[in-house]
Amino acid sequence: MAHVRVRFAPSPTGFFHIGSARTALFNWLYARHTGGTFVLRIEDTDKERNSEAFLNVIYDSLRWLGMEWDEGPGKGGEFGPYRQSERDAVYREYLAKLTAAGRTYEKDGAIWFKLLGERYEVFDEHRKKTVTKVKTAPTVIEDRIRGRVERVEDEDFVIFRSDGNPVFHFVNVVDDIAMQITHVIRGEDHLSNTSKHVELFKAFGAPVPQFAHIPLILKQNGPGKMSKRDQGALIEEYQRRGYLSEALVNFLSLLGWNPGDDREKMPIAEIIRLFDLPGVNQSNARFDDKKLAHMNMAYLLELPADTFVQKARAFFESLGDNATAKAALAAEPAFFREVMLLSQPKIKGFEELPAYTAYFFTDEFATDAKVRDKVMGKGDPKARLRELIEALPGFDFSNDAAVEEGIKVLATKNALGFGDYQSVARLGVSGTNVGPSITGMFRVLGRERVRARLERLLNA
């Protein structure tokens, strides 16, 4: 196989979203799988909408996701510059080539690309004026995912607007030629443009790259393509919420690609080894935030203890004036560590930590009224609380198993179940019915804080 060169060409006109990240990922994976080159090219010709801030978001997001580019802004390369706003001389040079070949003309102040073929006039859809059509053979697109696609391109099209700026179709093709791109991997929504691009490649006498139009990512609920405005669409949001980039990359790789079996969680090295264009599906992929959350949870579970605690602390630091965050960061490091490790098996993301751990860092927490009514309305909860408080001095708080054994002994003694004591104990120490294991909560909080909290519930 000839050396593969792929490119990712985003526009810095908005925040970096899931669809763009998945397109970048498939290009990056294919380059890494084949030992090729991943080129980052910035399509920043829209002067009114471009933003350096959004450009930096693109750079930061790609790096956060681990998709370092081989050529492009900040890296250089023999085919630069890599920002379209800096390539006007290149576009003028290629325009001159087309003009010299008789393939352009001016109309209404714009420059048009002239298709080859017999011309004829037809009325437009309103039958008010005529439109020039061109008799051409269908343009054949050999797509690595869609197969053979034929489209009829029967109208000339603008390549330079009346304001003197080149249009997307022209700069896209010129840059792919100049940068020797061998494979164009992009969203299916670009398939309708591809016949124009093929005709331009042919007009320049350049080899047509291999095309691979990947499936769209659909909204989680309802029809249509996922857009920047949809919840969960922005990469920056996952960074802010404390998701692991490895989990997001793994999840994105499976949005439209199949490794050939039913595996879902895979290290990036394995994804690179397996990734190839024949494994990309034709059918669109539907975004599923619950699946992503479970994927993230699986990655969190695998983090070494020190790494998890370090990342948890960094997340709390990112919350600024959040009351729980301030209390957590002010706690003794050893206590903070114990609370975090107790929570690690239970959370799907770091964003859950403040609500999940708040009662560890303050004794002044609210009690969930619905949970209270449910727990305190079953049997004789006050009696169970008194029995539990009286038994605490005999509990070994040194480890979870010892605490569990103490509660079991108490339950057996009073002909009750472990859950009968667990429910009132959890309500007393946390004010809710969800959280880490009750035995772990007892161990981390310690005998005196547990006693004080249970007595507060008893006397409420």
Curated annotation (Swiss-Prot):
Cellular-component GO terms for this entry: cytosol
Residues engaged in binding ATP: 228
Catalytic activity line of the entry: tRNA(Glu) + L-glutamate + ATP = L-glutamyl-tRNA(Glu) + AMP + diphosphate
Localisation per UniProt entry: Cytoplasm
GO biological process: glutamyl-tRNA aminoacylation
Enzyme Commission (EC) number: 6.1.1.17
Record keywords: Aminoacyl-tRNA synthetase, ATP-binding, Cytoplasm, Ligase, Nucleotide-binding, Protein biosynthesis
Pfam families: Anticodon_2, tRNA-synt_1c
Top-rank taxon: Bacteria
Class of this enzyme: ligase
Motif ('HIGH' region): 10-20
GO-annotated molecular function: ATP binding; glutamate-tRNA ligase activity; tRNA binding; zinc ion binding
Motif ('KMSKS' region): 225-229
Entry's family note: Belongs to the class-I aminoacyl-tRNA synthetase family. Glutamate--tRNA ligase type 1 subfamily.
Subunit field text: Monomer.
Function: Catalyzes the attachment of glutamate to tRNA(Glu) in a two-step reaction: glutamate is first activated by ATP to form Glu-AMP and then transferred to the acceptor end of tRNA(Glu).
Descriptive protein name: Glutamate--tRNA ligase
Organism (species): Opitutus terrae (strain DSM 11246 / JCM 15787 / PB90-1)
